[in-house]
């Protein structure tokens, strides 16, 4: 079996099991058993359970952030035409839905995992997400703040989180 195939099998199994059982309740042994690979394969390819979790999130967030940043660049290329609040909110949803799925329920599983990341104690993951993907989200939030100056930034922040949470829990 090719290394890349092993990595994909592990990530697929991890996504499914973490979404079903949560992070703490899912062991590496359970993941490798479901993936049909040797237990040592996780340490070889990822180094740790934390790194596996981060790699799992990168599968969706990497392409999503690239497409979100591209779309923001495209819309901001014409500074004389500012997008509306509704357009910016639509951009976020459109880019999330535009990530090419590997299977039919990828987005649903990812949203469930994202909800778990914030409801279970996954401090390492929150820190990782901020370090790796925070730049594009900060840019997005600044644009929202510009087009909705009457709303306090903290309120916009929580409204966007509520919107994403509603999307996550409805899938």
Where are these regions (language model features)?
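Helix-turn-helix
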Residues: 9, 17-59
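Short alpha-helical scaffolding segments that buttress acidic/His motifs in well-ordered protein cores
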Residues: 92, 96, 111-118, 163, ...
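All-alpha amphipathic helical-bundle segments outside canonical DNA-binding/catalytic cores
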Residues: 148-164
